[in-house]
């Protein structure tokens, strides 16, 4: 009877276990430096809620690749939990006489190779884009997503990040472009999944022994 009661209590406790996947909680310390970090984070929300989508492929800067990339950014902007994004397509040319700064990559890409080559050259030489949102060889690009904390808390990080990955792969994979996710929210999810697996394993072993 005693063993049965202990087992029942252990199972009830196991079902109520929660994992705090915040990187801030992971590295929490009772130091002035950490308290300063918390104060700054409250005033200026940090990149702990920025997810990175890494797009890679030899066809990235072709007409087909850029069209697919643009489609992916549009889909990601509408994905649950995404409040905004920045990519190489955010780059603008110098303002004209009226003060309008046109996007370097227009919505309608030119059909002729020379016109496309001019756009690609401007993109690769842009100070904001080169080495930050686009690799020097033109085969790797970065999309930075700003996530809505309240939506992530409501839907869970697993749902939001899973939706982002699914949308990106759907738009890019058919065009020979691979997708990888990185950034603090993705790391948080990996930590959470690993800790939950370990908890289940160790609690299961505890019940057995």
Protein language model features and the residues they cover:
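Second-shell loop/turn segments in exported
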Residues: 24-27, 58-63, 151-153
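Membrane-proximal juxtamembrane linkers immediately C-terminal to transmembrane helices
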Residues: 32, 41-50
């Amino acid at each position: 009877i005693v063993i049965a009661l202990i087992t029942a209590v252990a199972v009830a406790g196991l079902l109520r276990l929660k994992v705090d996947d915040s990187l801030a909680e992971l590295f929490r310390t009772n130091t002035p430096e950490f308290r300063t970090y918390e104060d700054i984070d409250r005033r200026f929300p940090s990149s702990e809620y920025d997810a990175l989508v890494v797009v890679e492929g030899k066809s990235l800067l072709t007409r087909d690749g850029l069209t697919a990339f643009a489609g992916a950014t549009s889909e990601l902007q509408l994905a649950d939990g995404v409040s905004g994004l920045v990519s190489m397509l955010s780059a603008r040319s110098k303002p004209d006489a009226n003060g309008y700064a046109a996007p370097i990559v227009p919505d309608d890409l030119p059909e002729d190779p020379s016109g496309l080559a001019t756009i690609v050259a401007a993109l690769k030489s842009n100070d904001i884009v080169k080495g930050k949102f686009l690799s020097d060889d033109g085969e790797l690009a970065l999309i930075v997503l700003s996530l809505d904390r309240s939506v992530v808390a409501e839907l869970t990080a697993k749902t939001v990040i899973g939706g982002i990955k699914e949308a990106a792969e759907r738009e890019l994979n058919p065009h020979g472009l691979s997708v990888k996710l990185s950034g603090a929210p993705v790391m948080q999810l990996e930590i959470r999944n690993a800790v939950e697996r370990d908890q289940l394993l160790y609690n299961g072993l505890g019940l057995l022994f």
